């Protein structure tokens, strides 16, 4: 149970329940856990429990499957690692910051990662190219288009790299005389309201012309459909 005053736990549990943040959410949340543009409701208005994916990380923990060590004040013991039936770090990614450094790992597809792990177990000398045949790149929860593989390959090879993402869009007829650009997927962790604001600013400053309206119907917290 999460105490209402424990802000860090509140933020963490909200992130773990968001399908647009996690490739495989670890928290099954009931209530408003936020969107790409809005934060979650106060903890007293939400309920949460471990999702099936989280239970897969802790299954058989009481069967001596992993080593235990004392906690910080030696009053309890805690597992050094979780049994983890799947590679959670790769599947859900991670974000962290420390003094002078930061880490951001994007999410990946569960089936692809497990296939690569099984191949690596049977072929310990497998090359990066061999593994990328199974995992060609990140699998972002909200979709979007990854531009180029060079940055991804460098990140896999050295642990440092970057890649660009773009929205996914198509043109469709809005009326007999008008056509619109319909954006169906946005880059990872980019909210539709932010995009609409930037487009309107560009139109207002005359940097972008030919736009008569920008709309984003509310169709779900993890969905996107903007019409320009």
Language-model segments: residues:
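Gly/Lys-enriched N-terminal cap/neck module of very large, oligomeric protein machines
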Residues: 157, 163-225
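Acidic-residue sensor for enzyme active/binding pockets
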Residues: 1, 47, 78, 185, ...
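Catalytic phosphate-handling regions of large nucleic-acid enzymes and associated NTPases
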Residues: 9-158, 162
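Single conserved hydrophobic/aromatic residue that forms the stacking wall/gate
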Residues: 1-12, 222, 226-228
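Generic detector of ordered secondary-structure context
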Residues: 4-5, 42, 178
């Amino acid at each position: 149970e999460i105490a209402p005053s424990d802000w860090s736990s509140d933020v963490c549990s909200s992130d773990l329940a968001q399908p647009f943040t996690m490739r495989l959410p670890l928290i099954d949340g009931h209530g408003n856990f936020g969107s790409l543009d809005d934060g979650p409701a106060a903890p007293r208005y939400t309920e949460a429990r471990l999702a099936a994916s989280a239970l897969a990380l802790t299954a058989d923990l009481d069967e001596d499957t992993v080593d235990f060590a004392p906690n910080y004040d030696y009053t309890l013991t805690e597992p050094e690692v979780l049994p983890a039936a799947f590679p959670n770090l790769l599947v859900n990614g991670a974000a962290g910051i420390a003094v002078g450094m930061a880490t951001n790992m994007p999410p990946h597809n569960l089936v692809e990662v497990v296939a690569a792990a099984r191949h690596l177990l049977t072929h310990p000398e497998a090359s990066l190219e061999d593994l990328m045949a199974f995992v060609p790149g990140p699998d972002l929860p909200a979709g979007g288009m990854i531009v180029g593989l060079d940055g991804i390959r460098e990140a896999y090879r050295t642990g440092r790299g970057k890649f660009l993402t773009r929205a996914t869009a198509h043109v469709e007829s809005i009326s007999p005389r008008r056509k619109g650009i319909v954006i169906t997927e946005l880059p990872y962790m980019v909210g539709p309201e932010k995009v609409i604001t930037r487009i309107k600013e560009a139109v207002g400053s005359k940097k972008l012309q030919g736009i008569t309206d920008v709309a984003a119907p509310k169709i779900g917290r993890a969905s996107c459909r903007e019409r320009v």
